Amino acid sequence: MLIAALLVGPSTTPAYAGAAAPPAKLAPCLACHGADGQSQTAGVPSLGGQPSKYLLIQLFLFREGLRTAAPMNALTKGWSDAELQQAADFLARLPPPKPPADAGDPARLVPARALIADNHCNVCHRPDFSGQDNVPRLADQREDYLLTALRGYKSGVRRGYDSTMAEVLQPIGEAQLPDCAYYLSHWRPGK
């Protein structure tokens, strides 16, 4: 057995902290979204720690062509409902993204915190922005992804499964969206 292990060499499969290995169909997804749930790819969200129900809905929307993003539609085409659920459950068990090393620029954080509080983002996304049920985690998400999503909702390009985000973002100016994304991507308790 030892000889076989030496011949095969070290494993290149990431350890999943005692969790089961990812479903086979999820492998291409992890290449961009991160094997540990934390994306290192520009414009691609981190999925670790997202609520399973939220992930399931998004995967369903991609599969059905109700939300478009290359290559997600092609990757999920033909997935069964059970495969969507397995993928969502696996991703939800991965650790949430780590906050960036820098604590953030107070000149950007303070006004964004007030704007986010005034618009009650924490009501749906929770006070710690960890998300719940069908509402995504925003805390420590990639800033570039958050900004793209916020702009998409505000402009109506990204519709989601209801109009809540488009309505909530209407009073927020386009020029304020970058600071909102910055704040959420640098979120820490007590900030």
Locations of regions flagged by a protein language model:
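Extracytoplasmic/secreted proteins, especially bacterial periplasmic and envelope-associated proteins
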Residues: 28, 54, 71-74, 86, ...
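Bacterial N-terminal signal peptides
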Residues: 1-11, 22
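C-terminal capping alpha-helices of c-type cytochrome domains
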Residues: 77-99, 144, 170-191
